[in-house]
């Protein structure tokens, strides 16, 4: 059990806004992929929208800041899907680089 607790913590970055149902389903799949790689997924966009309103700018910003706090304790950030137009994911990538985290882009079907 000790080995499992010490697996790499991976911050899962993928888009949330837009087609939320499809994006949440995709994020769950990405987390399963991280688990299959013997790592621990951390997906703030599956957590904070459950308690914060993503359509309220103040609450959205709070959720993003909470996510960046989680990113700080992760070993790496893995980016999934088309993230080119996701402002939140781009912010997470910038923060990860500032923190010296490995940024990995995972292609679909990897």
What is each of the regions a protein language model found here?
Residues 1-110:
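Conserved catalytic or regulatory cores that recognize and/or transform ribose-phosphate-containing ligands
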């Amino acid at each position: 059990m000790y080995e499992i607790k010490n697996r790499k913590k991976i911050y899962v970055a993928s888009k949330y806004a837009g087609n939320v149902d499809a994006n949440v389903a995709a994020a769950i799949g990405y987390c399963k992929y991280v688990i299959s790689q013997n790592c621990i997924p951390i997906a703030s966009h599956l957590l904070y929208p459950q308690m914060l309103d993503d359509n309220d700018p103040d609450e959205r910003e709070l959720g993003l800041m909470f996510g960046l706090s989680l990113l700080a304790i992760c070993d790496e950030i893995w980016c999934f899907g088309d993230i080119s137009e996701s402002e939140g994911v781009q912010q997470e990538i910038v923060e990860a680089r500032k923190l010296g985290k490995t940024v990995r882009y995972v292609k679909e079907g990897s």
